[in-house]
Design a protein with these regions (language model features):
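Short loop/turn and low-complexity linker motifs enriched in small/turn-promoting residues
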Residues: 19-162
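Sec-dependent N-terminal signal peptides
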Residues: 4-16
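N-terminal hydrophobic targeting signals that begin at the initiator methionine
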Residues: 1-3, 22
Length: 162
């Protein structure tokens, strides 16, 4: 009899840990952002008093005009989980040049050789490389903090005068 009671108390304790729910609050900047938990939309931020089970979970945070964010979280049995997310805006940017024979590369991802290109870029620093005949001739960091048009000119050496 003692073994049965002992087993039941251990089972009840363990099942309480496994199946217990943890309080979840999610804040975002900006607000009114769609929050997906394990592929299910749980609403728009801020999220208050939602319940989440212990274990591994994936959050996906999405809002038009902002870079999407994915976040994996291992939830331990606890009293509460509070998450704060800051989404980076996406800006429409144009790159223009009158120079001929150049190839541009941004962040090792985007490449172009035309005189005008439009890109949607996440706010922050981006690496621009400029190639001519397969060799890097310029490299610079561009800070994107608003919609902007970037005009590229080759740096010309100063000529010596007599």
């Amino acid at each position: 009899m003692f073994k049965i009671i002992n087993f039941l108390s251990i089972f009840t304790f363990c099942s309480g840990i496994i199946f217990s729910q943890v309080k979840l609050d999610v804040n975002t900047i900006p607000t009114k952002v769609d929050i997906h938990l394990d592929g299910v939309n749980i609403g728009s931020s801020p999220i208050r008093n939602e319940r989440i089970s212990p274990g591994l979970h994936r959050f996906e945070i999405k809002k038009k005009g902002y870079a999407p964010l994915s976040y994996d979280l291992l939830v331990n049995p606890a009293q509460a989980v509070e998450l704060d997310f800051f989404l980076n805006p996406i800006y429409e940017c144009k790159f223009k040049t009158d120079e001929k024979g150049l190839v541009f590369e941004l962040n090792g991802e985007h490449r172009w050789d035309v005189d005008l290109v439009r890109l949607r870029l996440e706010a922050g620093d981006h690496l621009l490389r400029v190639f001519k005949i397969g060799e890097i001739i310029d490299e610079q960091i561009i800070n994107v903090d608003q919609p902007k048009k970037y005009n590229y000119f080759l740096k010309k050496p100063l000529s010596a005068s007599n």
